[in-house]
Amino acid sequence: MATHPQTPTSSNAFSFISKGWREVRDSADADLRLMRDRANSFKDLATSFDRELENFFNSATPPFSVPAMRSPPPKEIEFVKSLRPKLSEIRRAYSSPDFSKKVLEKWRPRTQIRINLSAIKNAIVSAEEEEEGIVDFEKRRRRRLSFWEEWKGEGEGESRDWEPIRVLKTRLKEFEKRGSSFDAFKNSEFVEKVKSSLKSMCKEPLESKEVPPLDVPELLAYIVKQSGPFLDHLGVKRDICDKIVESLYSKCKNHQLLHSLSGEESSVLGNGNINDELDLRIASVLQSTGHRYEGGFWTDHAKHDPLDNERHVAIVTTASLPWMTGTAVNPLFRAAYLSQSAKQKVTLLVPWLCKSDQELVYPSNLTFTSPEEQEAYIRSWLEERIGFKADFKISFYPGKFSEARRSIIPAGDTSQFIPSRDADIAILEEPEHLNWYHHGKRWTDKFNHVVGIVHTNYLEYIKREKNGALQAFLVKHINNWVTRAYCHKVLRLSAATQDLPKSVICNVHGVNPKFLKIGEKIAAERELGQKAFTKGAYFLGKLVWAKGYKELIDLLAKHKADLDGFKLDVFGNGEDANEVQSAARRLDLNLNFQKGRDHADDSLHGYKVFINPSISDVLCTATAEALAMGKFVVCADHPSNEFFRSFPNCLTYRTSEDFVAKVKEALENEPYPLTPEQRYQLSWEAATQRFMEYSELDRILNKENNGEKASVDKGKLIAKSASMPNLTELVDGGLAFAHYCLTGNEFLRLCTGAIPGTRDYDKQHCKDLHLLPPLVENPIYGW
């Protein structure tokens, strides 16, 4: 097999290091030889100096006798005599045979260079690449001058008697210069890189702060805290869990928290609560051990990453126009108003029914042959009412109509109809309904943030059926199960719904702008002195018993005499139309039944009073529309009507006698005109603003912190969710996995009321939506 030549980078670097090392060694040997020669020359110089001095004294003594000099000797001779003992000492010192050895011992280089060549190999190579050159070791040799050249150059024109001292000073200056040049070399970028490389290889463990380990009360407190939602699911109140956590953690808080956290953290915790202190205590312990939580068994890491700073919102609902129901109309308006913001792109995902199901659901025998035809109908209907062209995408998923449940059930994995590149934020309209029989990818795994909006009070409907109490009990826990497993946040339109996990109460619905315009028109007519309301009372709603018809007939039958002459027009279509009309005729009630129509129809503008006795609604859209048109509304004192109580035209009753009084009051008086603030409160602009706030989408879309608290430790953030496994997420993932396993069994699906064959879509759906067969989309490998 042919071998490819290796890149020369490493070999060149090694040869460069070897060459440099040889040059350093040779340079050191040359320096030692030069110093030895200088010492010997210094010794010879001292000997010659002593010899010349003796000759000088001998020449000063005459060979013949001279008369004694009475005058004192000259000063020069006295100086020479005084200098003679010192010169003799210098001569003896320099004549000593150990002089060269002592000089070498004094001036020998003391720094021993011990470099691990293999350890700094990579650092040398990087230095070559960055500086595009090598260290020139010849510079030292170029700077080296001959001892004798300097001696001769500096000695010209001066007396040679003091030349040894002058040369000694010159040598000392030279060593100082060489020392400064060596310091510059030590501080060079190359040496710094070598030092950093050596430090990185021999790096000591990071300075770890002594953090006391967790004790048993702390562990128990944290387990109870993380198990709060699960215990709440079992019926244990959250207040009890908080008290248990506080009692367990307070025992060890004082003597361990201050040791495990820095001063800044302690000041932060001083203003916090027990839960925050416990979370930061756990985080600090995990950080001291170097642990970092990278995701659990149920976590999917392949989520959408908004690299282009553009977010995607997918709205998934359970119904579509022309079925005039709340889950068809309200999500459509939500998509239109969310698409007005440039921060996100919006996709509305609605069910597609085969033609046989369309005939059962859509009014006036209206059917569509293709999704494109139905999309055109939806957009046309919407633009007539909002007055602007909404820029959002409409997609379809397979669905089947259940006559027993009177609702549309998804067929197959609904999440697969949102591409992974757009899987960022999901809004599930009726999350419990969408996930009862959901057998597919977990929503919270595919999407970064999942918000559920509860539209329907299913428990109230189920209680009216046979064995309703038992069914309601089972459905209640199934709803808790699926909403907890598949949602990050749940919004309940009113307190009329069951208390679901992760839920808050907020009305995030508005009214069609057309109704607000009708209200403004009626108010203008009244200001001109015209009579806007020429008719009495009416009721509009789907003709099924659960929509308030039972309560209405009971009230009118009980107070038939009190409401003598009272006439009520009823508009609606539905499965129970014949039964409701038969009951009204049997009781001889003054009810005028008419076919259902749009609430904005011109024929309904003249009615002054809208009566809605329903207590099964979560938030009655018709009530909001009647208030927007400036009418009186008589409704029950019920949590579903809590949002409307602030409007002066909303008259609520508690008893049947109170109902009669409110009806008479409304018929005898004129409604109050709406203020601009009240009109805005009913609008979709205000509803969208409330939705962004309560669903936490405003912070997510603005890239703000998602609510996780952090504390500073030596300049670093300790994020609670980044360094510790979340027991709640682990439990939620287990619930989702169990739900996936159960919904994959066809027998269990049928036992719980699923439509046969809805685990996957059928051939007709493949044909209508141009889908691959389920076995091709999700193959099963085996024999």
From Swiss-Prot:
Gene Ontology BP term (one): galactolipid biosynthetic process
Q: What reaction does this catalyse?
A: a 1,2-diacyl-3-O-(beta-D-galactosyl)-sn-glycerol + UDP-alpha-D-galactose = a 1,2-diacyl-3-O-[alpha-D-galactosyl-(1->6)-beta-D-galactosyl]-sn-glycerol + UDP + H(+)
Q: Which GO terms describe its cellular component?
A: chloroplast outer membrane
Q: Please name the CDD domains in this protein's record.
A: Glycosyltransferase_GTB-type
Cell compartments where the protein resides: Plastid, Chloroplast outer membrane; Plastid outer membrane
Q: Tissue range of expression?
A: Expressed in leaves, roots and nodules.
Annotated signal sequence range:
none
GO molecular function terms attached to this record: digalactosyldiacylglycerol synthase activity; UDP-galactosyltransferase activity
Pfam assignment, any one: Glycos_transf_1
InterPro entries noted in UniProt:
DGDG1/2, Glyco_trans_1
Question: What EC number(s) has UniProt assigned to this enzyme?
Answer: 2.4.1.241
Induction info: Up-regulated in leaves by phosphate deficiency.
Write out the entry's keywords from A to Z: Chloroplast, Glycosyltransferase, Membrane, Nodulation, Plastid, Plastid outer membrane, Transferase, Transit peptide
Is Plastid set as a keyword in this record? yes
Q: Which family does it belong to?
A: Belongs to the glycosyltransferase group 1 family. Glycosyltransferase 4 subfamily.
- Its job: Involved in the synthesis of diacylglycerol galactolipids that are specifically found in thylakoid and in nodule peribacteroid membranes. Specific for alpha-glycosidic linkages.
The name on file for this protein is: Digalactosyldiacylglycerol synthase 1, chloroplastic
